[in-house]
Amino acid sequence: MSQTPMPQPDQAPPVDVGQPVDEAEAKRRRFKTHGRKKGKVNDTRLARIEAGLLALSLPPGSADRGALIDQLGGNGQSQRVILEIGFGNGETLAALAARHPEDCFIGIDVFLEGFGTLLNRLTRGDISNVRLVCQNALQVLLERIPDASLDGVIINFPDPWRKKRHFKRRIVQTEFLDALAPKMRSGADLTLATDWANYAEWMVAHLEPHTAFVNQAEPGPFAAPPPWWIETNFERKGVAAGRIIRHLHYKKR
């Protein structure tokens, strides 16, 4: 086994002193999303993952939603573009893509092991409506997703970064929501789930005052599981440990 050479999306490229930095780059430097990237993958599996990522990659530069759908392999019949941030082992992403072949799906993560498992699921299920990116989520939003393109965003069980000094690493932050909001169409769904009570409260504290999102839970703040909800191995472990799964459902104004 060899140590997996993981990408380092949080490292901004050097810029010559005196050179202007565009707005997207400046925003990416101010706020970085984090994921735990440690792990080992043997060379054979790594080669397969890299080949799979190359085949299913989402290149940057789509000018608008139509161009994005073209890059995703969709057509005029494509109904929705759904993004999952942090898909883990790909249970939800693969299942939803199989259920809805008319839709286009994008998965973002930084775990190579998870990509390997998801790629196997896609191959076994003959699922072709998924594109994948192994990169920092904020960077993907700024560089690869045109404005008003996403019909749904799923963030299930993001790393809670439980130590207070690490709270700044949590993905749900005001600046992240500021970057996400313009990428979503009006009426698009943002669904989140966590098994850590403190993080659930943190999510609510950041989403409730945000002017771009409206809580759909009644009476709230937490929602019932969405109709499409798929129980994952990660969820089962949390429940077995005695933790409560809390769901949030917001719509983009």
Curated annotation (Swiss-Prot):
<feature type="active site">
    <location>
        <position position="159"/>
    </location>
</feature>
<feature type="binding site">
    <location>
        <position position="136"/>
    </location>
    <ligand>
        <name>S-adenosyl-L-methionine</name>
    </ligand>
</feature>
<keyword id="KW-0949">S-adenosyl-L-methionine</keyword>
<feature type="compositionally biased region" description="Pro residues">
    <location>
        <begin position="1"/>
        <end position="12"/>
    </location>
</feature>
<dbReference type="InterPro" id="IPR029063">
    <property type="entry name" value="SAM-dependent_MTases_sf"/>
</dbReference>
<feature type="binding site">
    <location>
        <position position="84"/>
    </location>
    <ligand>
        <name>S-adenosyl-L-methionine</name>
    </ligand>
</feature>
<keyword id="KW-0808">Transferase</keyword>
<dbReference type="GO" id="GO:0043527">
    <property type="term" value="C:tRNA methyltransferase complex"/>
</dbReference>
<protein>
    <recommendedName>
        <fullName>tRNA (guanine-N(7)-)-methyltransferase</fullName>
        <ecNumber>2.1.1.33</ecNumber>
    </recommendedName>
</protein>
<comment type="function">
    <text>Catalyzes the formation of N(7)-methylguanine at position 46 (m7G46) in tRNA.</text>
</comment>
<feature type="binding site">
    <location>
        <position position="163"/>
    </location>
    <ligand>
        <name>substrate</name>
    </ligand>
</feature>
<comment type="similarity">
    <text>Belongs to the class I-like SAM-binding methyltransferase superfamily. TrmB family.</text>
</comment>
<keyword id="KW-0819">tRNA processing</keyword>
<comment type="pathway">
    <text>tRNA modification; N(7)-methylguanine-tRNA biosynthesis.</text>
</comment>
<dbReference type="InterPro" id="IPR003358">
    <property type="entry name" value="tRNA_(Gua-N-7)_MeTrfase_Trmb"/>
</dbReference>
<keyword id="KW-0489">Methyltransferase</keyword>
<dbReference type="GO" id="GO:0008176">
    <property type="term" value="F:tRNA (guanine(46)-N7)-methyltransferase activity"/>
</dbReference>
<feature type="binding site">
    <location>
        <begin position="232"/>
        <end position="235"/>
    </location>
    <ligand>
        <name>substrate</name>
    </ligand>
</feature>
<feature type="binding site">
    <location>
        <position position="159"/>
    </location>
    <ligand>
        <name>S-adenosyl-L-methionine</name>
    </ligand>
</feature>
<feature type="compositionally biased region" description="Basic residues">
    <location>
        <begin position="27"/>
        <end position="39"/>
    </location>
</feature>
<dbReference type="Pfam" id="PF02390">
    <property type="entry name" value="Methyltransf_4"/>
</dbReference>
<feature type="binding site">
    <location>
        <position position="195"/>
    </location>
    <ligand>
        <name>substrate</name>
    </ligand>
</feature>
<feature type="region of interest" description="Disordered">
    <location>
        <begin position="1"/>
        <end position="39"/>
    </location>
</feature>
<feature type="binding site">
    <location>
        <position position="109"/>
    </location>
    <ligand>
        <name>S-adenosyl-L-methionine</name>
    </ligand>
</feature>
<dbReference type="InterPro" id="IPR055361">
    <property type="entry name" value="tRNA_methyltr_TrmB_bact"/>
</dbReference>
